[in-house]
């Protein structure tokens, strides 16, 4: 309703690495000096690789969940979420072409490509993606994801605080 009738945007062009490494670095709990005197340092390349993959998976997961729960078929929100899901699925396919992530690949193999406004989305797909990325993150420290480096943006959202 907020998008379809209220004119609000259905989302932003969010990319986890650039947003989490800009003016607000999200490393305080794990940074040098934590918990008493944490530093505001950028994430390591290994951590940025994991953030990059996580951001894409969460974008697809959220978009699929939104499509599954849409109230107005063919409305602005529905169309925007289908476009967003297709963009995220395309990015994820690119990622999966250069890294091994079998659990994630298994879930994405059951997602229609491309997704249309009339596509049936497996109601278990969003949770399947969430579970798969959780398992993946528990088994990877990012060192095995070097192939993602050319895909990861070096730009940030805002300038980091220098303190």
Where do the model's predicted regions map?
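Primarily the internal scaffold of c-type cytochrome electron-transfer domains
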Residues: 1-162
